[in-house]
Amino acid sequence: MQDKNLVNVNLTKEMKASFIDYAMSVIVARALPDVRDGLKPVHRRILYGMNELGVTPDKPHKKSARITGDVMGKYHPHGDSSIYEAMVRMAQWWSYRYMLVDGHGNFGSMDGDSAAAQRYTEARMSKIALEMLRDINKNTVDFVDNYDANEREPLVLPARFPNLLVNGATGIAVGMATNIPPHNLGETIDAVKLVMDNPEVTTKDLMEVLPGPDFPTGALVMGKSGIHKAYETGKGSIVLRSRTEIETTKTGRERIVVTEFPYMVNKTKVHEHIVRLVQEKRIEGITAVRDESNREGVRFVIEVKRDASANVILNNLFKMTQMQTNFGFNMLAIQNGIPKILSLRQILDAYIEHQKEVVVRRTRFDKEKAEARAHILEGLLIALDHIDEVIRIIRASETDAEAQAELMSKFKLSERQSQAILDMRLRRLTGLERDKIQSEYDDLLALIADLADILAKPERVSQIIKDELDEVKRKFSDKRRTELMVGQVLSLEDEDLIEESDVLITLSNRGYIKRLDQDEFTAQKRGGRGVQGTGVKDDDFVRELVSTSTHDHLLFFTNKGRVYRLKGYEIPEYGRTAKGLPVVNLLKLDEDESIQTVINVESDRSDDAYLFFTTRHGIVKRTSVKEFANIRQNGLKALNLKDEDELINVLLAEGDMDIIIGTKFGYAVRFNQSAVRGMSRIATGVKGVNLREGDTVVGASLITDQDEVLIITEKGYGKRTVATEYPTKGRGGKGMQTAKITEKNGLLAGLMTVQGDEDLMIITDTGVMIRTNLANISQTGRATMGVKVMRLDQDAQIVTFTTVAVAEKEEVGTENETEGEA
């Protein structure tokens, strides 16, 4: 026989319905905070239970077991351990920015130590926790029955400060989680007031007063872009970094000292992780790690080897350990019974609306209470004005009910007024007592009028909220603990993990690039160029050599007017005998695009440093180096080229320097760079030389009166001329003759300034290359033809040349002779 109490259900439907019920219960009633008071149900019940127990800051601490037992029995039937753990967290300075529970005893440590059992510890409400419950007995919030309908509990607390932002929240529900960072109380209150004063305020405006989270453990927030995104959308991520300093011991060794760790980081686990990294040789240079923390604060010491770089080790620790972490914003909270991801403005708006409701309900409660009391006093005053008649009625009545009815009829009193008259003691009949009653009545009438005015004027409600927030700020606000590192990188770049060292970058004529340690290569000063290296093919030579640092930036300018940027360490390191890597493997060059110039941009480059551009068609431009601070991986346009023009070269000009430009037809113009005003990166430029028809620019150099001007013609003739024969004139002229151009010597192949003691590398269009010393080239006048520098095969022409420091000659082992065919 089938049991009538059994109900047949579809298992699939029942599972769906039951799981949804369970999920919503966890989401709404356990894991997520309410946007109004920032509390989950367990925290709200703990505070309310402590308030009902009278465990206030002015009373002695009470056993934690008594508190958790009372909360569990009346409001939260989910086990005492979960209640105690929540209460412990509210008493930990490293968990809550402003602790809501004042704990007495062992409440754990930031090293992950657990709190003592609840039978050993004691607790009471903190002073700021009182502000969460203030006026709760004035009908400021709604109450509901508890789980067994024997008690009443609040759905939300009045919360006289925005606790959701001030103390933050974390929680994992079903299919969703919340992670809201804590903030500084004073800054958060200022943000609330700013919204109230200016409803059109933007997130950027809010960040002027509330710049970012303020974690109880301090540490550093790297950059503000992640904060802005999180405040704007409710989701985002920031980088938290330990506060560190590098100390130098008496013996000259360095040590890293950590005084603040990121929020919720266990420094004992960090200690263990560092030791493991050292043992696995993933980090080298650490000799010892010890925790010297005490009651005065955190001090975590990492000893460094004498020859190791503390900065590099520190950056590796940031990358590999929790000394640097990411905090992911997910500002999810319950609003109107629904879980929502909220922006900063939405959280502030919700709190303001809650406070308006609290103030209105409290004002209404106070008004009703004052009106009730005034009603009684009004009756007493009527009785005192007719005291003889009142006494006669009372004496003539056989019962209280008869006397009350007669008083109500005679003096038009209410039941409450007549009862108050009957309850009045004889001493209230004195004249002094009447004056007191009259005074109290007048005060109540004034209070009622004021309360009614508050209810009628929203601006007064807003002012009360702001005044009360100011009071909370005055009592409990403190200095910010977390420092916001504005403009700092959000993550570690590779260069932070690479020790800075001086290196040489070489670029060959055929486009091979490599990095060499300066210890292996005798070089010019940083920024020098043109020293011949080794490892290139017989038909190749080093055209560009730059002395730089692994951390400095190199700018690569192409014939198409584009610029690319690499850091020194991004160029592969090769030995002296290796030819290097094709530069097209590092830079996204077009098929017909080639590197014309490599410029080293040092970190300490002066503010008046300019890049001077010269094009084939005589256009020049002067642009500040700062314009090239941010360059995308695929390059940027360095100048706007017109028609079929192309970039000849780029010069790094600092201070007051002259420029000389040479043309194919043998003319040169010299002018001061200040004759070209500074222009933006995308500007086209101005005319530097007025070219004759068919003429083009073949070279440009910086020039001083101590230099010599070297010119080489296409048919192998060349000469050196002292710079003083080239007077400084205005920009845009046709130029002065710098070479006698004939059919015999050919057009100019190039022009450059030299010191006179360099070697010269010359290459022809057939691939033949020669190296010769400049001393072999005669020094002649400006308008002469020059001497034969290189014997050419029939129909061959010189296409390019560059100088090579003579100091490198023996070391490199290249003879002053023609190398032969490519």
From Swiss-Prot:
Compartments (UniProt record): Cytoplasm
Q: Which residues form the Topo IIA-type catalytic domain?
A: 32-497
EC number, as in UniProt: 5.6.2.2
Tell me which GO cellular component terms the UniProt record holds.
chromosome; cytoplasm; DNA topoisomerase type II (double strand cut, ATP-hydrolyzing) complex
CDD domains in the cross-refs: TOP4c
Q: What other facts are recorded?
A: Few gyrases are as efficient as E.coli at forming negative supercoils. Not all organisms have 2 type II topoisomerases; in organisms with a single type II topoisomerase this enzyme also has to decatenate newly replicated chromosomes.
According to its UniProt entry, the function of this protein is described as: A type II topoisomerase that negatively supercoils closed circular double-stranded (ds) DNA in an ATP-dependent manner to modulate DNA topology and maintain chromosomes in an underwound state. Negative supercoiling favors strand separation, and DNA replication, transcription, recombination and repair, all of which involve strand separation. Also able to catalyze the interconversion of other topological isomers of dsDNA rings, including catenanes and knotted rings. Type II topoisomerases break and join 2 DNA strands simultaneously in an ATP-dependent manner.
Kindly give the PANTHER family that the UniProt entry links to this protein. DNA GYRASE SUBUNIT A, CHLOROPLASTIC_MITOCHONDRIAL, DNA GYRASE/TOPOISOMERASE SUBUNIT A
Q: Which protein, by its recorded name, is this? A: DNA gyrase subunit A
Q: Report the source organism.
A: Streptococcus pneumoniae (strain ATCC BAA-255 / R6)
Q: Gene name on record?
A: gyrA
